[in-house]
Regions:
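N-terminal nucleophile
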Residues: 1-217
């Protein structure tokens, strides 16, 4: 299965790009952007400049392909999450890039970004993920979010690709988690949810009585 994360390491900078949407559109835009990096790498010294460069290549692909996509009943739906620290950045940055080429940056008010199938994995992130969370806690929540999506969507499943970037390291560690690695987490999470439902009987007792139901023992 093709990775949906592209990691770029250069002289004094690191960037990773996560994507969702049509594979053909994604591959073309990333190819154009990688070629631009090879030609003009030293001109992109700030993260926002790199994101703007990727946005320009996305618009280029849109102008080339959108007419033909529409004729085939398809839509230009490429979304990207871009994390980077460039040579003149004083800290890492994380952006959500929309198909139109506009973007937003992560902040304390929005401690995570999510693309693709978002309906099922988003609730646990909204409830539990905080801007101050450690990388290890963020990984746990990310895996649980992935499992929640997998349980409710036939289009999502292992493997799961993960990237960790530490500030000022200018390097990123990557790992692809297979089904065997994720299965113990899936079993734990299923059991934890079932246990929480069982333990909810007492708080729900008054609600049950109010509509004529006998509370669980």
């Amino acid at each position: 299965m093709a990775k949906k994360i592209a990691v770029h390491r250069g002289d004094g900078h690191t960037m990773f790009i996560l994507t969702s949407g049509l594979r053909s559109v994604r591959d073309k835009a990333i190819t154009y952007f990688e070629e631009r990096l090879r030609r003009n790498e030293h001109d992109l010294t700030r993260s926002y400049q790199a994101v703007n460069a990727l946005a320009e290549e996305m618009r280029r692909v849109y102008n080339e392909d959108n007419e033909w996509l529409l004729k085939a009943g398809l839509h230009f739906d490429l979304h990207c999450i871009v994390g980077s620290q460039m040579t003149e950045d004083d800290a890492p940055h994380l952006f959500l890039l929309y198909p139109q080429g506009n973007w937003v940056e992560v902040s304390k008010g929005t401690p995570y970004l999510i693309i693709g199938e978002t309906r099922f994995g988003k609730p646990i992130l909204d409830r539990a993920l905080r801007y101050e969370a450690s990388l290890e806690e963020s990984l746990r929540l990310g895996v649980l979010s992935f499992n929640s999506t997998e349980a409710s969507s036939a289009d999502v499943g292992p493997p799961m690709d993960a990237v960790v970037y530490r500030a000022d390291s200018y390097d990123a560690s990557e790992h692809r988690f297979g089904a065997e690695e994720l299965e113990p987490i899936a079993q734990f999470w299923q059991g934890a949810i079932e246990h929480a439902v069982e333990q909810s009987a007492a708080p729900f007792a008054a609600l049950a009585r109010s509509i004529g139901l006998d509370p669980a023992p």
